[in-house]
């Protein structure tokens, strides 16, 4: 019978850890990142929050960066089959040996109880720094303001996708309240790109951006225009200060992906 390796034991250990822990995720995240030498401070991070489309938007951003020659880290959740799907560089999952090393690094420097997501976040930052990536695309777990990813204080840009009612017991029972939680990722003077399709949410996000003296680029239904929806793909135009009726093609028939790709 094959002996179980250290990697399998670590995954079992992580799977037994609570999804939640005392104090808020952002407080725990700050503390453990500090204890681990703040690896995130050397990284160029694109921080993505939202209710709908944040996974797709992260994938588009990462692929665009990678296609332009940048070594790109991608941190997402949840995973479908393999826990290592959450931590990728240029589309490749972290190796089992690097996963072990990252876990041990976090375990050796933590001084308090962590939730499952905290481990994954700090392991990702450790690995991305060690691999010297050019950019990191980072998806929030739940919400924004109190999410562990919000311990990252120096993103290069914040991104907020479409907002709708979700996790009402935790984040709020109106679109505006949920938008306020998501807008909590906006940092002083750091630009933000957000969806403007849900007007009530966009108002809250723009207001927060003004308070934080952050330039805010809003992507709404006037930004993109369907040209054709044919078997297997969509052609659409983008109109903004960067593109004047430039045509793009997506290998999907899901029309909502026009908005995610435009963001």
Question: Can you name each region flagged by the protein language model?
Answer:
Residues 51, 55, 161, 262:
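Conserved G/P- and acidic residue-centered "switch" motifs that form tight phosphate/ATP-binding loops
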Residues 3, 134-139, 155-248, 261:
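Acidic, Mg2+-coordinating active-site environments of NTP-dependent enzymes
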Residues 26, 30-34, 38-41, 67-153, ...:
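ATP-dependent carboxylate-amine ligase catalytic core
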Residues 109-113, 249-255:
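A short glycine/serine-rich beta->alpha loop
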Residues 1-50, 57, 63-68, 75, ...:
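Short functional linear segments
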Residues 24, 56, 117-120, 181, ...:
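A generic structural signal for residues located within well-ordered alpha-helices
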């Amino acid at each position: 019978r094959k002996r179980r390796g250290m990697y399998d034991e670590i995954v079992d250990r992580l799977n037994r850890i609570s999804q939640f822990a005392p104090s808020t995720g952002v407080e725990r995240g700050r503390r453990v990142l500090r204890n681990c030498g703040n690896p995130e401070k050397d990284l160029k991070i694109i921080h993505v929050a939202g209710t709908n489309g944040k996974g797709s938007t992260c994938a588009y951003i990462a692929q665009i960066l990678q296609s332009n020659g940048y070594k790109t880290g991608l941190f997402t959740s949840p995973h479908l089959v393999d826990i290592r799907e959450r931590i990728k560089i240029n589309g490749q999952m972290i190796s089992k040996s690097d996963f072990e090393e990252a876990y041990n690094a976090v375990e050796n420097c933590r001084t308090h109880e962590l939730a499952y997501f905290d481990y994954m976040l700090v392991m990702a930052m450790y690995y991305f720094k060690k691999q010297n990536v050019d950019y990191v695309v980072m998806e929030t777990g739940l919400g924004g303001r109190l999410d562990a990813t919000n311990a990252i204080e120096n993103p290069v840009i914040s991104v907020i996708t479409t907002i709708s009612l979700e996790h009402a017991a935790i984040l709020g029972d109106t679109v505006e309240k949920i938008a306020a939680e998501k807008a909590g990722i906006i940092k002083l003077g750091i630009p933000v790109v957000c969806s403007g399709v849900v007007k009530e949410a966009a108002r809250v996000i723009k207001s927060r951006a003004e308070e934080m003296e952050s330039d805010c680029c809003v992507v709404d239904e006037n930004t993109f225009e369907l040209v054709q929806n044919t078997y297997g793909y969509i052609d659409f135009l983008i109109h903004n200060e960067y593109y004047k009726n430039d045509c793009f093609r997506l290998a999907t028939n899901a029309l909502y992906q026009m908005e995610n790709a435009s963001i």
